[in-house]
Amino acid sequence: MTRLHRRPARGALLEYRTYGGWSVQRPEHGTLGRFSPDMTRVLPDGRTVALTLRLDRAAYQLYREAGASHSQALHNALLCPAFAGRYGAAARGAWELELQAPPSDRVELVAMLWPQDDRDWPRGEVNLLEGRVGTGQTMTNLHWPDIDGVPQHAPAMIDLDVSQWHRYRVEVLPGRIRWAVDGRTVRTLETHHAPIDTPVHMVVQAGVNPAIQDGWRDNFEWEQTILFRPLRAPRGGQLS
């Protein structure tokens, strides 16, 4: 492990893992597609991550030849991105990122804090933005377990065009979570469930809305890219 005592450098925030390299993993939550490591890459500017969603036509045809239905072949051939930051720290403090989604209502995405140890979930999940592009809204959310360990959450929609560049910020404070976009507070939640001591990391992932099937044709091609820049995280964390 590499321990960082000062505010993490941008390079540390760009260190990441992806999903789907060794087994089939999917975005789920009603979306289509499967994660593919090739769909996530750092651009030559050294500060922007491209997260691409793409229909692999060759894979679709191979699945069809193997006897898969159209819907199953499409589900398997839609390649999706995931960025799981390797820099983790206790959630307390400010986390910032910039993101621009493509102008396609076939794209669904989430940018969030996620617990370093999956066993801590739902504690540690804080959503900066979540939902389908093109609706004019996005969702902020906090997740936590109740006294019996049953997952609870507090979703709230905000009006926002996520296909434009925006700077997203969430502050995890004792008794309070505050969300801001472009320097303006858009939501404050007073809560006893702020995960101030839970180690978390940044995650961005995306899936394909099933409406993509509505435009299907024999020569159909499709590719969309989300651009993302991790900007700030609390100090004192480490690379996993």
Predicted regions and their residues:
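Low-complexity, Ser/Thr/Pro/Gly-rich disordered linker/stalk regions
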Residues: 1-104, 233-240
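Aromatic sugar-binding interfaces of carbohydrate-active proteins
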Residues: 11-24, 129, 176-227, 236
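Glycan-recognition/cleft segments
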Residues: 42, 112-143
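Short beta-strand segments enriched in hydrophobic/aromatic residues
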Residues: 55-57, 99-101, 115, 172, ...
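Extracellular/lumenal carbohydrate-interaction signature centered on repeated Trp-anchored short motifs
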Residues: 76-93, 157-164, 194-195, 222
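Short tryptophan-centered beta-strand motifs in secreted/extracellular beta-sheet-rich domains
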Residues: 95-97, 164-172, 177-179
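Extended, low-complexity, turn-rich repeat/linker tracts enriched in Gly/Pro/Ser/Thr and Asp/Glu
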Residues: 101-107, 117-120, 174-176
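Short, aromatic/His-centered strand-loop micro-motif at the edge of beta-sheets
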Residues: 144-167
